[in-house]
Amino acid sequence: MDGYQYEHHCAKLLKQRGFRDVAVTKSSGDQGIDVIAYNENVKYGIQCKYYSYPVGNQAVQQAYAGAKFYDCNVAVVMTNSTFTEPAKELAQKLGVQLWEKSYIPN
């Protein structure tokens, strides 16, 4: 699976979990958001990272900025992997949700 395929995989998982109006953004110039989805009238901006190593700060920064650009209520980084401690700290400060191992919370 590559990054593009993972974005579509994430979109499929979101639909299965009851998110609606799930859309994958264009691959270039996406402003840091790969998928936009709604759950209970909350707009999520999701950065998808398919990595073989822990995701770092840059993805958190991209999700935060991209969510602002798309007027999302919630910024998320979703990965098949895990996150570095600095990324976790930054996400907590910025209010970015981190979904590890493709886990989508209720």
Language-model features: locations:
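Mixed-charge (Asp/Glu-Lys/Arg
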Residues: 1-106
